[in-house]
């Protein structure tokens, strides 16, 4: 995690040359042995330590007098010039804030055409229209995802149930602590170059906001044309645990199923979502692309996500005679890891 650490922010504020920034990023990559660079709420977590409670894309931080836009631009260039396979992984400013789709678009523009990956984009695709000042902006966001070649994203789908949100965005987690369920939470930044916040949370279809978050995530999946540009995630565990992936896949592959769930919501969001108007159903091939080959490609894992000769023998075999999509994905016939059978008939 970079973009909130004092050393980097000091370099940027002093006007360090890009090559000096690149040297620092390269050092961090080698020292930590990580596979990529992520920025969480660029500049915002550091600003929070100086009692700023919000930081927009073109707003200067109190301590270093630099903007999130500048941080994203410089880090995106460093990652690109160093040849890191995975592009800069960005958790945008203003997570969860109504109207934040505008700052998400500005963050995308900040990369100036360089490769960038926007993570849990559902949480950054909110408008502020309507009598509740909360609306879907998935159409506006996916327009950018579809038209910008070097832009990819994962969704961070919300599904109903109890979970725990865990984030390096201590600014946002502190703002959310009043919603903790159960009412026990933690935020800290002691000896953290970024931040840390854990807030338990229960998503329910009795909440207008939670129900619309559910719809916004599905809209984002279904409006993104290329499955190589969007990846299946629940931002585990923040939107839902990854064990719910079979249920999510069924929502994407079965329009009747998702329409039925929408109709049975405890709150009526039908006038606030275009979900029913979207007729698309993901194919099995598109699911394979979105969950296997495309993630391997963007991470630079050339031996993964493929059935070609010399690829790793990581293979899942499903029983296509099982009619229920969720059941089929939940109980694979075989899971083979490095050529060894590790799961047979779902166990």
Task: Cite the ranges covered by each PLM segment.
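A generic structural motif
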Residues: 1-5, 116-128, 154-158, 260-269, ...
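Mid-domain alpha/beta scaffold segments of enzyme catalytic cores
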Residues: 1-20
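Histidine/acidic residue-rich metal-binding segments in metalloenzymes
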Residues: 17-39, 45-230
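Short, glycine-/Ser/Thr-/acidic-enriched flexible segments
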Residues: 44, 95, 123, 158-160, ...
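Conserved, mostly hydrophobic/aromatic
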Residues: 91, 235, 310, 339
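Polar helix-capping/helix-linker motif
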Residues: 148, 254-255, 325
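His/Asp/Glu-enriched, well-ordered alpha-helical/loop segment
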Residues: 195-198, 214-309, 315-316
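C-terminal cap of metal-dependent C-N hydrolases
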Residues: 297, 312-347
């Amino acid at each position: 995690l970079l973009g909130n650490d004092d050393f980097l922010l000091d370099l940027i504020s002093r006007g360090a040359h890009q090559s000096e920034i690149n040297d620092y990023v390269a050092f961090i990559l080698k020292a930590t042995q990580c596979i990529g660079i992520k920025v969480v709420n660029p500049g915002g977590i550091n600003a929070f330590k100086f009692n700023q409670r919000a930081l927009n894309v073109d707003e200067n931080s109190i301590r270093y007098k630099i903007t999130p836009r500048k941080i994203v631009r410089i880090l995106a260039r460093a990652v690109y010039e160093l040849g890191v396979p995975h592009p800069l992984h960005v958790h945008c400013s203003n997570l969860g804030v109504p109207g934040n789709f505008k700052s998400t678009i500005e963050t995308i523009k900040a990369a100036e055409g360089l490769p960038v990956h926007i993570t849990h984009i559902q949480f950054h695709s909110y408008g502020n229209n309507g009598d509740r000042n909360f609306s879907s902006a998935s159409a506006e966001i996916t327009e950018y995802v579809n038209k910008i070649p070097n832009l990819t994203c994962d969704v961070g789908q919300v599904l109903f149930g109890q979970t725990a949100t865990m984030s390096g965005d201590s600014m946002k987690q502190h703002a959310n602590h009043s919603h903790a369920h159960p009412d026990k939470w933690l935020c800290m930044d002691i000896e953290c170059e970024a931040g840390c916040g854990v807030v338990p949370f229960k998503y329910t279809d009795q909440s207008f906001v939670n129900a619309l978050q559910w719809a916004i995530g599905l809209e984002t999946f279904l409006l993104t044309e290329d499955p190589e540009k969007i990846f299946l995630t629940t931002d585990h565990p923040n939107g839902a645990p990854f064990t719910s992936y079979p249920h999510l896949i069924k929502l994407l592959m079965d329009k009747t199923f998702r329409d039925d769930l929408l109709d049975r919501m405890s709150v009526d969001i039908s006038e606030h979502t275009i979900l029913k108007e979207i007729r698309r159903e993901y194919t099995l091939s598109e699911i394979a692309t979105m969950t296997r080959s495309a993630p391997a490609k963007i991470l630079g894992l050339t031996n993964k996500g493929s059935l070609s000769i010399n690829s790793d023998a990581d293979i899942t075999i499903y029983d296509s005679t099982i009619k229920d999509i969720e059941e089929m994905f939940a109980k694979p016939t075989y899971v083979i890891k490095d050529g060894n059978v590790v799961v047979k008939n779902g166990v």
